[in-house]
Amino acid sequence: TTESHMEQLILKHFTEEDFRRVWMRKIGGGVIGGKACGLLVARKLIELNMPEYAGHVEPHNSFFIGTDVFYRYLVYNRCAELKARHRLEKEHFKETEELTKRLRGGSLPEDIREELSDMLDHYGTTPIIVRSSSIMEDGYGNAFSGKYESIFCMNQGTKEERMEELEEAIRRVYASTMNEQAIEYRRKRHLLDVDEQMALL
């Protein structure tokens, strides 16, 4: 995380084993974002402070796709320069439209696709949800509730069909950083100058 309050909670309560478990489930570099950190911290606080309820919490079975994958996706699909100009020009509509188009039509680097394929092997044909977990999301004072997409994947059919469904879900979540609600929320919170980075949960 890059959020100081969240960082303090994590450093105070997490063990070396907790960090290792996240690392084992992480795809790509960078941080895992606000929503993922919030989820992990909430689970840890229940475990430490309300052990009588810990047994009722479902076992953690999520993977984390780091913010560096989003950055690489931008570069790989010729979006990085456009995104930088878009931010400098205070999220101008023309750049928003073009950037959304490129994000929705992009492709992932092959090494990331290989790791995603391994992740699908882990889940088998169990349905999954690709959830946004941006740097700003669910941080102190900036909830971003419902501003970015979460995509349900049936995860059925051939391996190729399941991979395509997963990649399309990732593209949609990445593109949701450009939706009108998210931009307006950033504008109201005076966050247009902040480089929003998207991790996935």
Where are each of the predicted segments found?
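Nucleotide/phosphate-binding sheet-loop regions of phosphoryl- and nucleotidyl-transfer enzymes
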Residues: 1-201
